Design a protein with these regions (language model features):
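Generic detector of low-complexity/intrinsically disordered segments
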Residues: 81, 89, 110, 161-162, ...
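Generic short N-terminal amphipathic or hydrophobic helices
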Residues: 155, 169, 173, 187-188, ...
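Intrinsically disordered, low-complexity regulatory segments enriched in Ser/Thr/Pro
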Residues: 188-218
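Amphipathic, interaction-prone secondary-structure segments
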Residues: 165-198
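Low-complexity, intrinsically disordered short peptide segments enriched in small/polar/basic residues
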Residues: 115, 137, 153, 165-167, ...
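C-terminal accessory helical subdomains adjacent to catalytic cores in phosphodiester-
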Residues: 2-17, 22-161, 174
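Mixed-charge, Lys/Arg-enriched low-complexity segments
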Residues: 153-164, 206-224
Length: 224
């Protein structure tokens, strides 16, 4: 992270994500305190943390549950039987993720399952545990929403250029994984904003339009 942040802004990656399983961190209070301190430092520099507790497998599990339910797995080993019940012979390896057909078809390529996992993840993150309660969550949806905001901006710019028959000088200004403002000459034209799973386009005059973030925009869309 430090190496990337030391680069000049024009040479730096568009976004820096840190994807982390927190099960081993939380076990050690001293280690977790150091992590929290570093997290606050890097968040101020624009790094987006993608935490999962206990581990990334809770994200995979959300793809395959029939309905949302809060769970309290403390470690990967505790969660493992649940993930193996829906993904037999599951392995926490790059080879498995790349080669296993069941994983590919139900996790990587299944749009309906992905939208369900996003919904369940947001519900899990909204829950506030009581003191010392173990609760599971994943923030992988933040990365998906971030890239979907960028995709929608790219579509807006392309469609405007096509409609006006000239290049359009607009720029994105990203506040977080939830919000992207479409800018022209430092003025906001409109803002793309997530509220839960819903994406809206809000214009400065107050007009608001719903956007389906799973489908490309086209010329028939009201915001164009």
């Amino acid at each position: 992270i430090d190496k990337e942040l030391r680069k000049k802004p024009q040479e730096r990656a568009d976004a820096i994500f840190l994807v982390i399983d927190t099960d081993t961190l939380i076990k050690n209070k001293a280690q977790y305190a150091i992590y929290q301190e570093a997290k606050e430092k890097y968040k101020k520099q624009g790094v987006i943390f993608i935490e999962s507790h206990p581990c990334i497998e809770i994200w995979f599990l959300y793809h395959l549950l029939n309905k949302f339910a809060r769970t309290n797995f403390e470690t990967y080993e505790a969660l493992r039987p649940a993930i193996e019940s829906v993904l037999p012979k599951y392995e926490k390896t790059a080879r498995y993720y790349q080669k296993n057909s069941a994983f590919r078809d139900s996790i990587l390529k299944n749009q309906a399952n992905r939208e369900k996992a996003i919904d369940f993840s947001i519900k899990a993150c909204k829950y506030e545990p009581i003191e010392d309660e173990i609760t599971n969550y994943t923030e992988v949806f933040k990365a998906i929403h971030f890239f979907r905001l960028l995709q929608k901006f790219a579509e807006i710019r392309l469609l405007l250029a096509e409609k006006l028959r000239s290049n359009v000088a607009i720029q994105p200004s990203i506040d977080s994984h939830k919000t992207l403002s479409v800018m022209q000459n430092e003025n906001i034209i409109c803002t793309l904003k997530y509220t839960g799973t819903k994406l809206k386009c809000i214009f400065t005059d107050g007009q608001t339009f719903d956007i389906d973030d799973t489908k490309p925009l086209d010329m028939t869309n009201s915001i164009i």
